[in-house]
Amino acid sequence: MDPLRAVSLDLDNTLWDTPPVLLRAESALRAWLEAEAPEIARRFTTADLTRLRLSVAAESPTRAHDLSFVRTEALRRAARAAGYDDALAERAFSVFLSARNDVVPYAEVPATLARLAARLPLYALSNGNACVWRAGLGRHFVAAVDAAGAGAAKPDPRIFARLLEVAAVPAASVLHVGDDAEADVAGARAAGLRTAWMNRTGTPWPAERPPPDYEIADLEGLERLVGRLLGAPD
C-alpha cells in the first residue's frame, strides 16, 4: 500500500453541521431583501427563490455545479422582474455568502485539525461555496478545491483529478474524508483515493453499496486512523 501523504476533507456536515448554517443564511438574505429590495421580497418567497435556482440549474447544466453562479443568477432574475439592477443581486448574494460562511465547527474540529495539519498536508474538497478561510479554519489547510473551480462536483472524477493536481501526489496516497456515501466515498474510490466515511450520526452504511475503507465518528477518530496509517502512536 502506498504511504499516506495527504488528507482531503469534505466541509459541510463533516466539519460543521450545515442545515442550521443554511437556515441562518436564508434568514439573513430574506431580512436584507425586505429592507433593501422590498419589491423582491414581496414578489418572491424563499420557496420561490429556491424554485428559481432549480430552474437556473436545469437551464445551465454545464454550470449547475457552481452554486454561487446558480444563486446569483436566480437573484439577478428576481431583481430584474422586480425592477432592480444586477448590482443589487450581487449585493444580495454577498449577504447570503457572508452568513453561509458563519459556521460553528463541531467541538473537536479546531484543535484536531491543528494536530492533523502538523502531521500531514490537509486539503479542503467541497461541492459547496463555503470557504475554509472565511470560516476561520484556513490556517490548517494547504489549499482548497471546490466544484466551481474544478468545473465539476463530487462524485465526478474531475474534481478529484483537480485535487491530485494541486496536491501533486498519487491518488492511492490520499485519504478522502466525507459524510456522503455517493459524493465522497463512491467518488473518491472511483478516482483511486482511499476513503473514510464520516458517520457522526451512527447511521448504518447502505447495504447495497461497497463499504468505505474506513469509518469514523468524528475528527478525533480520523486522528487515530491517521496515526495507525502512519505507523505512529495515536
Language model regions located:
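Asp-based, Mg2+/Mn2+-dependent phosphohydrolase catalytic module
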Residues: 1-7, 19-20, 84-87, 110, ...
